[in-house]
A protein has these predicted regions:
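N-terminal cap/leader regions of alpha/beta-hydrolase-fold enzymes
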Residues: 1-134
Length: 134
């Protein structure tokens, strides 16, 4: 598998994006793995890698790029992500405020930037695209 991080230009600045795909072949159907409220993290990169192993070109964009690439990782003693409703009020409100700063229009704009990036010569096809995530 080929894994890399790239900065994809958007009207609001560079968007860090994790990309994974097979070593050989292509063009691959593209799949966008959309992050959840917590932001991008290793678990999402692993989901993308698993999808990539069966012949897809996977992208995990940092949709919080306008806010400085925020990532939340609150874990319990067993290193599992803590549920949002188990956070104290201050952390809970901080995460909701971050998520509230991301609109549907922004996600659509960022998705368009991903498509433009692929169309600029990546070994992927925008003729057949999919998405998973939140």
């Amino acid at each position: 598998m080929r894994n890399r991080f790239v900065e994809i230009p958007t009207p609001d600045g560079a968007m860090d994006t994790f990309i994974t795909r097979s070593e050989e072949g292509g063009p691959f159907p593209a799949v966008v793995v959309f992050m959840d409220i917590w932001g991008v993290r290793e678990e999402l990169f692993e989901i993308a890698r698993r999808i990539g192993t069966v012949g897809y070109y996977c992208m995990v964009p940092d949709l919080y790029h306008r806010q400085g690439g925020i990532r939340y990782e609150y874990r319990d003693a067993n290193n599992r992500m803590i549920s949002l409703n188990r956070l104290d009020e201050a952390r809970f409100n901080e995460i909701l405020a971050t998520r509230g700063g991301l609109t549907g229009a922004m996600v659509v704009e960022d998705t368009g930037a991903l498509i433009d990036f692929i169309d600029d010569g990546e070994p992927a096809s925008t003729d057949a695209m999919g998405s998973v995530g939140y």
